[in-house]
Amino acid sequence: MNYKYLLFATLILTSCRGVQYLARQAAPGATYAETIDTKSKPITFQTKKIYHTPFGVSATNQFDGARLCDFIAINDSTYRIVSTPENEPINPSPWYAFKIWSNIPREATLVFDYGDFAHRYFPKTSSDGHHWMAIDSAQIDSIDGKTTARFFLTKDTTWIVAQELYTEAELRSWMNALQAAHHQTVDYGIAGKTKLGRDLYYMDLGEKKAKHKDLIILLSRQHPPEVTGQFALKAFIDGLFDSPALAEAFFKRHNVLVFPMMNPDGVALGHWRHNVGGIDLNRDWAVYNQPETRVITDFINHYTYKNRNRVVLGLDFHSTWSDVYYTNLSDSASVIPNFTKQWIDSIKSGLEGYQPRVAPSALRQPVSKNWFYVHFKAVGITYEIGDDTPRDFIDKKGRWTAKKMMEILME
């Protein structure tokens, strides 16, 4: 039976808080002012291979997170890096990630070619795929509208990426470490499968008994290149445990449900934005045409019905050009009125010199922040981190914003 098109939910009202629960497993569709077609569209898969040139310089995309659609020798010291999107139209987030080496030590100029799209991400390098360093700004230039960068190559492999690689392997390692450190409070499992059969993980943070607790929902990595948003989510979750006394009190009344990597297919394939269905997942929160949004909305709905939770807040972690909070025009009619202003104001108090930028918008598009309000009357916020925001500040801000959220919700 296709629950997506059937609306036979029974609304159950709790006596103590007037909270509505949907007595069904699958999330119903929603109507928004702007209709967006999210039925699957064809995509182009890159060919996974090792590229060899006549000059002894080679490159490969044979690893998760890679994007290298072609590698062309212009001459013995200049090479073209081609990255094309999975399909179009698409947001201009040209992702690249590859390994490169040379048979002799040499300086090589790499020309980044994205077709009609402009360069966005400042290159990072690594010798092991785990520890990253941004290149010196003196190494990078622009010639005839194309970005070029100079690298010293040897027989040893150099990884060159748009942003630090954070794939499913890194995610599992972090979840295992978090669970080991907080085994009574952290649980994780598999909510379902992606279009290609990869695991969609969930994390359940709180005491084992989740019934009748207020619920916070966290999302990340709907868009594969948005690694800084993933870092902010990690820091936010780490911040939930920074103060043991606050955490103990908070988790007696709240649980936190996390979907830390919503688009693992896109992450593994080095996509610019979309899933394997060729769709921006953050436009599929109306009819759930894509398996990732369908699995996660069904999981949330089943969890909240089973445990009789009141969803109070949804935060979706993303990356963009600079830090910003995308909010709804007002949260006065939400289940936690005026939370947004309290939270934003409190964030400033612990981050010297930081002025949060807030961009409110109406409930027009089928995006996650709107879905939280439409379905649960919960506050929905898109928590955006800049591409180049310093990583230590991402960590500091993530932990601080978690602490202030906990304090406000405990009032």
Predicted regions and their residues:
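Active-site/substrate-binding loop(s) of hydrolase catalytic cores
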Residues: 187-205, 210-357, 373, 380-387
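Sec-dependent N-terminal signal peptides
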Residues: 5-13
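Extended acidic/polar, glycine-enriched regions
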Residues: 137-183, 189
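His/Asp/Glu-rich mid-to-C-terminal helical/loop segments that flank catalytic regions of hydrolases
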Residues: 389-411
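Extreme N-terminal flexible tails
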Residues: 16-154
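Short, hydrophobic/aromatic beta-strand segments
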Residues: 108-112, 159, 230
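Short glycine-rich, acidic/polar surface loops and turns
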Residues: 360-379
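A mature extracytoplasmic/lumenal domain signature
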Residues: 102, 114, 162-164, 206-207, ...
